[in-house]
Curated annotation (Swiss-Prot):
Signal peptide: none annotated. Carboxylation allows a single lysine to coordinate two nickel ions. It holds the Pfam family Amidohydro_1. Residues 129-567 form the Urease domain. PROSITE patterns: UREASE_1 (PS01120), UREASE_2 (PS00145), UREASE_3 (PS51368). It is found in: Cytoplasm. The active site is at H320 (proton donor). SUPFAM superfamilies: Composite domain of metallo-dependent hydrolases, Metallo-dependent hydrolases. This is Urease subunit alpha. It comes from Tolumonas auensis (strain DSM 9187 / NBRC 110442 / TA 4). The lineage of its organism: Bacteria, Pseudomonadati, Pseudomonadota, Gammaproteobacteria, Aeromonadales.
Length: 567
């Protein structure tokens, strides 16, 4: 038997079981848990390589072979960190295992034939496309930024740079809902829109769900009163849709206790649950410990740094149409920004009490930084708190699975779309992101939508090879023409689908139904289901979880930052 060194093997086929990989320039290290490929029978494409006729490629017809194989990929997902070939068929994930030609190779579960395209995954990390569940649809250019960061699904509301949209994630009323669904047809991104949930009577909310809303958004700028909260949740229960809430910072219509009483035991997604993005001051963070609350953060406070507090005030004044000349407006802004609760938010993420991270795009958050900010938070906690209890000193697999779940599977579960997206599992849309380890979480090397490359860094189109400068992200064929309709998905309520809305509006994209939104609970938030008793001191803003004080220092330096953006 021929022997090859681990280094030589990793250089040729990528890391295998027991090998460790550093994520970008962070202090996070993964260790490969399992290798689904077979030593000596790995498949690789290229001159003199394996995937050639009669060798790694067989004679199967298209119906019996893959459309695409990603070879020797290092997969990071909530369910594991493994090395495998990834098969794609008809725009969906066909399997994770060993690819090749079963006529001459043992253990083949994914058949390569003449109709199979190849993406070389050797040395690359593959993750599921990210899901950003807090989008203000202020401008369509957000989609390009998000896609090129590794996000493939965006959920939220808005109509463009209207004053209401600048502040709230609502697409109000059937007319605007229809127009946004029509606009979505031209965007290479899975999209779902939230209607405005602030109403004390149900009819105006029902008509928005019937018009296609995947859920309803309660926002304090429209009045998040106990009456509107109760009514909105009643409609959601009847229509199997989710409710997202930005609670009452000013405590005008009640305190956090009143909001929680209005919610009762019904499921709700609480946006920016720490409070700097808005919510009962100073103690909305208490909600993250409840069984029916699905808590998320937005990325302006991720992670806590020496600059976090300073930049928030001006952002807040602009986004919520406040006047710096009015003392009450300034006091409103200042009440939302508390060092103590932001610091506690870092730790609550690390312990799995906060379940999701999103952007709050152009409304205090940066749409292209959800993934980067998530891993910066994980790094900061590793440096400040050490390894998680279940991780040995040599790797951070538990922490890595916890943090990747925050922007993939958990928002998918929260909004009833986990049957379509959110993880690398057979049957789901092949929304996949490839990364070189040195650039992980910062700059993808390829973004697939529905099994087709939608965006990638690309060099001069007039060059003799693909790599000459200037290299920058460019749209690829999967983002163009009718191919885009076959590889992107618009999410709608079941009520809208059953009433024939896609045909009425002439929608040509894939249609996904949101479902099981009302049965999901905090316990279903994978790796992020901790439910501590949270207490906030109303004078000092100190936060305790099960009696333990939560505090940490702001970071002065972060990885995944300037060194990656010199060019």
């Amino acid at each position: 038997m021929s022997i090859i060194s681990r280094q030589a093997y990793a250089d040729m086929f990528g890391p295998t079981t027991g090998d460790r990989v550093r994520l970008a320039d962070t202090e996070l290290w993964l260790e490969v848990e399992k290798d689904f490929t077979i030593y000596g029978d790995e498949v690789k494409f290229g001159g003199g390589k394996v995937i050639r006729d009669g060798q790694g490629q067989g004679q199967a017809l298209s119906r019996d072979c893959l459309d695409l194989v990603i070879t020797n990929a290092l997969i990071i997902d909530h369910w594991g960190i493994v090395k495998a070939d990834i098969g794609v068929k008809n725009g969906r994930i066909a399997g994770i295992g060993k690819a090749g030609n079963p006529d001459v190779q043992p253990g083949v579960t994914l058949v390569i034939g003449p109709g199979t395209e190849v993406i070389a995954g050797e040395g690359s990390i593959v993750t599921a496309g990210g899901i950003d569940s807090h989008i203000h649809f202020i401008c369509p250019q957000q989609i390009d930024e998000a896609l090129c960061s590794g996000v493939t699904t965006m959920l939220g509301g808005g109509t463009g740079p209207a004053t209401g949209t600048n502040a709230t994630t609502c697409t109000p009323g059937p007319w605007y809902m229809a127009r946004m669904l029509e606009a979505a047809e031209s965007l290479p991104m899975n999209l779902g829109f939230l209607g405005k949930g602030n109403a004390s009577l149900p009819d105006a909310l029902h008509e928005q769900v019937a018009a296609g809303a995947i859920g309803l958004k309660l926002h304090e700028d429209w009045g998040s009163t106990p009456a509107s909260i109760n009514n909105c949740l009643n409609v959601a229960e009847e229509t199997d849709t989710q409710v997202a809430i930005h609670t009452d910072t000013l405590n005008e219509s009640g305190f956090v206790e009143d909001t929680l009483a209005a919610i009762g035991d019904r499921t709700i997604h609480t946006y920016h649950t720490e409070g700097a993005g808005g919510g009962h001051a100073p103690d909305i963070i208490r909600a993250c410990g409840l069984a029916n609350v699905l808590p998320s953060s937005t990325n302006p406070t991720r992670p806590y740094t020496v600059n976090t507090v300073d930049e928030h005030l001006d952002m807040l004044m602009v986004c919520h149409h406040l006047d710096p000349a009015i003392p009450e407006d300034v006091a409103f802004a200042e009440s939302r920004i508390r060092r103590e609760t932001i610091a506690a938010e870092d730790i609550l993420h690390d312990l799995g009490a906060f379940s999701m991270i999103s952007s709050d795009s152009q409304a205090m958050g940066r749409v292209g930084e959800v993934i980067t900010r998530t891993w910066q938070t994980a790094h900061k906690m590793k440096v400040q708190r050490g390894s998680l209890g279940s991780d040995p000193a040599r790797h951070d697999n538990t922490r890595i699975k916890r943090y990747i779940a925050k922007y993939t599977i958990n928002p998918a579960l929260a909004h009833g779309i986990s049957h379509e997206v959110g993880s690398i599992e057979p049957g789901k849309l092949a929304d996949l992101v490839l990364w070189r380890p040195a650039f992980f979480g910062v700059k993808p090397s390829m973004i697939l939508k529905g099994g087709m490359i939608a965006a990638a860094p690309m060099g001069d189109a007039n060059a003799s090879i693909p790599t000459p400068q200037p290299v920058h992200f460019r749209p690829m064929f999967g983002a163009l023409g009718r191919a885009m309709h076959s590889t992107r998905m618009t999410f709608l309520s079941g009520l809208a689908i059953r009433s024939g809305l896609p045909a009425q509006l002439g929608l040509n994209s894939l249609i996904g139904e949101v479902k099981n939104c009302r049965s999901v609970k905090k316990a279903h938030m994978i790796h992020n289901d901790w439910q501590p008793l949270i207490e906030v001191d109303s004078q000092t803003y100190q936060v305790r979880a099960n009696g333990e004080l939560l505090t940490c220092e702001p970071a002065a330096v972060l990885p995944m930052a300037q060194r990656y953006f010199l060019f």
